[in-house]
């Protein structure tokens, strides 16, 4: 039994070491996503060289506030959990907030445009597919409409009670089509346009926030 235990211990040691440190599709990949924070497009997190973080990008927006999330280290065809925390600064329970998610040409970044400046608390486990592009999220305190995206969302948070999927037109500004299956996972970073920062942010943001004028 001692030899069996010893061999078993060695097996699990090397197995988990491989998953965490050497396998691009392993658990280290997951941890990398949520450990990385890049408050500005020029910042680079401290990650091993084999993992390259994706840039944070803000696409052009006419008049609405915009913010961006970036992803990294996630292989395609892999579902992962999106855990993003927001606050509702307007304390509204009936307003309709419209946002659109755009899959960038690098197939590893989302840009989110919002018509209203508000924050939500939600947790999503999802994969992205070009065949589903419209998601309505109805929460118990507000509604957000995510359009022009390729997303199949499984909402695991109690804040949302309704999901509807339909087809929608694709966004311009995409230099290449999105992949058929794309991993949707966000890091905890957020960027705002300098002229859209609100004056009445009552609760502190749970992310590092830094104005940026970066454009795609």
UniProtKB/Swiss-Prot annotation:
This protein's GO CC annotations: membrane
Keywords: Membrane, Transmembrane, Transmembrane helix
Miscellaneous notes: Partially overlaps RSC8.
Segments traversing the membrane: 1-21
Record's subcellular location: Membrane
Designated name of the protein: Putative uncharacterized protein YFR036W-A
Topology of the protein relative to the lipid bilayer: Single-pass membrane protein
Gene source species: Saccharomyces cerevisiae (strain ATCC 204508 / S288c)
């Amino acid at each position: 039994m001692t030899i069996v235990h010893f061999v078993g211990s060695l097996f699990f040691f090397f197995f988990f070491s491989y998953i965490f440190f050497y396998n691009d599709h392993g658990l280290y990949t997951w941890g990398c996503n949520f450990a990385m924070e890049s408050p500005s497009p020029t910042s680079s997190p401290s990650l091993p060289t084999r993992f390259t973080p994706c840039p944070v990008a803000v696409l052009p927006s006419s008049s609405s506030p915009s913010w961006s999330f970036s992803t990294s280290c996630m292989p395609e065809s892999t579902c992962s959990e999106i855990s993003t925390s927001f606050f509702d600064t307007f304390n509204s329970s009936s307003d309709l907030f419209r946002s659109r998610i755009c899959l960038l040409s690098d197939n590893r970044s989302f840009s989110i445009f919002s018509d209203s400046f508000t924050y939500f608390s939600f947790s999503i486990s999802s994969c992205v597919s070009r065949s589903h592009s419209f998601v309505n999220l109805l929460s118990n305190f507000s509604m957000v409409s995510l359009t022009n995206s390729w997303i199949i969302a499984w909402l695991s948070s109690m804040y949302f009670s309704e999901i509807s999927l339909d087809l929608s037109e694709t966004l311009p500004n995409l230099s290449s089509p999105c992949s058929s299956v794309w991993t949707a996972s966000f890091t905890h970073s957020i960027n705002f346009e300098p002229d859209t920062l609100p004056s009445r942010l009552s609760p502190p943001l749970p992310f590092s926030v830094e104005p940026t004028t970066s454009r795609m």
